[in-house]
A protein has these predicted regions:
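Ribonuclease/tRNase effector modules and their secretory precursors
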Residues: 1-139
Length: 139
């Protein structure tokens, strides 16, 4: 399994309100560039758009501590989506055959390993940035 080495580090801050300020600032810079829905272009998917609004909806379903952990990895996740050429781990959803889940693995400049999950609709080809989280090491 190949890992993408991001040039970004964790976002600064120890509380949710501090971290969300930096994450929203980065999100708003992406949003201002696009006309309709915010997206980033991915090198792995040959320049296809990966929409990032679903991430925020998914994030608000988590508790405050988990939100803070995930938001700290936000800038590294965006860097991975834009620049990674490493092949992801692809998971086929048994309940919905039209959905593929791609898991990209990366490492921040601080050395923290993380996982980015992208959902792809096979019918339309639409790709959505779903989630970012710490990679749990299981032995």
């Amino acid at each position: 399994m190949q890992m993408f080495h991001s040039k970004q580090s964790l976002l600064a801050g120890s509380s949710y309100t501090e971290v969300v300020k930096y994450a929203r600032k980065e999100f708003n810079t992406i949003r201002k560039i696009t006309k309709r829905q915010p997206y980033v272009r991915s090198k792995y998917f040959r320049g296809d758009k990966i929409f990032i609004t679903i991430f925020w909806d998914h994030l608000m379903q988590k508790n405050r501590k988990e939100r803070t952990k995930r938001l700290k990895l936000y800038s590294a996740a965006i860097d991975l989506l834009r620049n990674s050429t490493e092949a992801p781990e692809t998971i086929f959803d048994n309940t919905n055959r039209d959905v593929l889940l791609h898991r990209f693995y990366g490492k921040t400049s601080d050395g923290i390993e993380f996982c980015v999950q992208v959902k792809e609709d096979k019918r339309s080809g639409r790709k959505d940035f779903m989630s970012v989280f710490d990679k749990k090491i299981t032995k």
